[in-house]
Amino acid sequence: MSINPPRRLLQRCLLALLLPLALVVLPAHTAAAATGWTVTGPSAGSPTAAQVTLNDDGTLTFAASSHGQTVLSPSPIGIRTSAADLTTNLTFLQRSDRTVTESYTMTTGKQRSRQTAYTETTLSFSGTGGARLDVVVRASDTGVAYRYVLPGSGSVTVTGEASSWTVPASANAWLVPPDREDQGQWFATTAGGAPTNTYHQPALFQIGNAYALVAETDLDGRYAASYLSHTSGSATYTAQLEGGITTTLPLSTPWRTAALGDLASVTQSTITDDLAAPSKVSDTSWIKPGTVAWSWLSEHSSPSSEARQKQYVDFAQRHGWGYVLIDEGWSSSWVPDIVSYAKARGVQVILWFNSSDLHTAAQRDQWLPQVKNWGVAGVKIDFIDEYSQPTLQWYDAVLAQTANLKLMVNFHGTAMPRGMQRTWPQVVAAEAVYGSEQFHNRAAFDTILPYTRNVISSMDFTPVVFSMTSRDTTDAHELATSVVFESGWQHFADSPESYEAHPEALRILDQLPAAWDETRLLGGSPGKEAYLARRVGGRWYVGGISAGSARTYQTPLSFLGSGQWLAETVRDGSGGLTHETRVVTNADTLSVAEAANGGFVTALCPYTSGMSTCSPKGQAGALKGSQSGLCADVPGASRTNGTQVALWDCQGQANQTWTASPTGQLTVYGGAKCLDVKGGATSDGTAVQIYDCNNSAGQRWTVGSDGTVVNPDSGKCLNAAGGGTTPGTLLQIWTCNGGPDQTWYRANTPGAYKGKGSGRCLDLPGGNQASGTRPVLWDCNGGTNQTWFSTVSGELTVFANRCLEAAGGATANGTAVQIHDCNDTYGQKWRVRSDGTVVNLGSGTCLDAVDAGTANGTQLQLWTCNGGANQVWTRS
């Protein structure tokens, strides 16, 4: 007899049998879901992803991919403190997600206006004893990062991190070994083949077609910097903290960052700034990047000579360079005098300090307010050497005080900045590089820096040293570093005499800005070549450097805007630097021949008829209308934004004195205000006014060889309204028509040029106006054949349409000086120096009375500048 149990009883029995199986399976499924997390960039189909994994032993690893390729293999992460070891035995608690978008502006760098977007995931874990660890992961479309957050309160000691990066052992690597002041030499190797050592950050790795630049950012005195520790044969690089860390909770550690993608994406990355703390300086109007004349490298003893430093000030004034750095050796007895001397010439002074003189709060309270009272614009602080927590706390104090005093800062002999320039924007430069002062063969070395050190922050390389004989680079390579290397204070390290012996180099250096609106990598490879395009306003500069054999570089110009552009290239020629121009469009290709270990710079600016240079030329002085004979005037010497500029009798006052800046602005009141198209409008009749300089398109002006002053944004010319010629006629922009109401001359030097040695004037014999006529010395008589004007374009003209020139554009001593039809060549460009010499920009030599003659009829020539009485002229 069989017994059939009731159906309900069978169901209960089956449930009892299956339930334990369910209890086993479900927790296993939950654990699997919780042990791996992926964070992708914010855009649809983002190519970048970060992966965090919790392993069976409670350890964490971090990995990253780009375009579907694993770039950073799983590597240990975690942190150890005096309270807990948060590198192992971790248990997952929870996950939270958000999207982070930011816009911010930098005062320096490869791109002043920044926009960034990240996906952020916070993964919370508990460790032994219930200690809490949050791992915050961010992914953008071009990089990944993570940091640790430790909640709680009270003090804690950080004893180490497990943070590391792993790449294939065969990956190409570019590393810099530890060296005092971060001045080691970058070298190429493989990730596994690098010697056992610690290495500075950043470090660059190539994995297939992808690159990863690993670094850290958002570092201050709450923590310490780290090196990358590596064992030969391993492909893992682990963070090794510089000294002990005692800090307080809650704690957010610095970000461990990796810029990912192709070489252009990594080079153009701003991840170090994007993840740094926002600016602590609300008003940054006083922070002004610029070109600096610096004497120490070319003549070590010169900073102790006030007289020599004044010569550097004069040089900076002549060339529109904004700053002079007085290095070790200055004396407080004469610094106030030279600051006043420089200020009167539109030049600002930077002073060098040994960090030991600013080590304590008392020392800083003594010196920093003092130099501010002297009128010094900023300080260069040297010999800092390391980034331990006590040193970072010293940085915090210095940065807060210099911001409060409105002193700009350059840290020299320093470790690599790690986000400092965003948080403290008065830091316009930092060294942390094996720069020009090392006097080494460095063509290949130079081509690594744009992809590594200079990605992270502004780099004070002190470039462009022609007089250095122990180098393997050409002159054009030296010149090109002024564009390829970025620094908010670009310290050009040669002497005035050396630069003025290279006029083609000054053609570029005199117009370069020190901060950029946009940067693009056009091509290159670390250790071989680097080609970058940088934009400021409406003009571009392409700089290229190479190592190895001669080559021809070609690149499409598709990044240009519409219309015609003047491409002005300076490169190596058979007899030194050579200059060539070409009119191009964005459909053309730039092609430049490079010498071995050579380079080039190409300036690209909107083209107007007759242009042959992009250089904003001319000295400070009045703009005089050729039709009216009146000068561009700010009525009533007003400094109020929006005051419309008008014609008025020329009086030589500050409200009629205009200076062409290196970035194409026309400034008045020593650079305090700019000539501005009202509202940035482009229509005929738009008022031209003064306004705070803001680098906008409405403040850009290009000078044509015909004397027109063109706003490239509108394509319109500076114009006297209604063709007026009476005082009070307002100025506007109008369609360029070549009329006399659109033609301007620099009116700061009308009249005769009288020789100091002879007492006689520069004269055209018999009033001869024919091209080729040679001027001579003659008794001063005030005639039109002795009346010379300095044009906006830098020419010395006579009879309105003849220019003083070096015959045939020659540059040798003894070259005849003559008049010729004005053609905007450098043989017709002259600069009147403060010592009374008149320098030809094509040759760098001086207007000279032949054989030091003083008699009537003595002819003029070019000759090496020597300051003799036959080369000194006064204007009357």
Which residues fall in each region the model found?
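Secretory targeting and sorting signals
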Residues: 1-33
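N-terminal accessory beta-strand-rich subdomains and adjacent acidic, glycine-rich linkers
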Residues: 34-275, 577
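Glycan-recognition and catalytic regions of carbohydrate-active enzymes
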Residues: 123, 497-541, 573-581
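An acidic-aromatic substrate-binding cleft motif
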Residues: 251-323
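Aromatic- and carboxylate-enriched substrate-binding clefts and catalytic-loop regions
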Residues: 329-474
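Carbohydrate-binding surface patches
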Residues: 525-563, 600-603
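C-terminal beta-strand-rich structural cap/linker in extracellular carbohydrate-active enzymes
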Residues: 583-614
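Extracellular glycan-recognition/adhesion modules and their associated mucin-like linkers
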Residues: 614-641, 654-682, 697-725, 740-769, ...
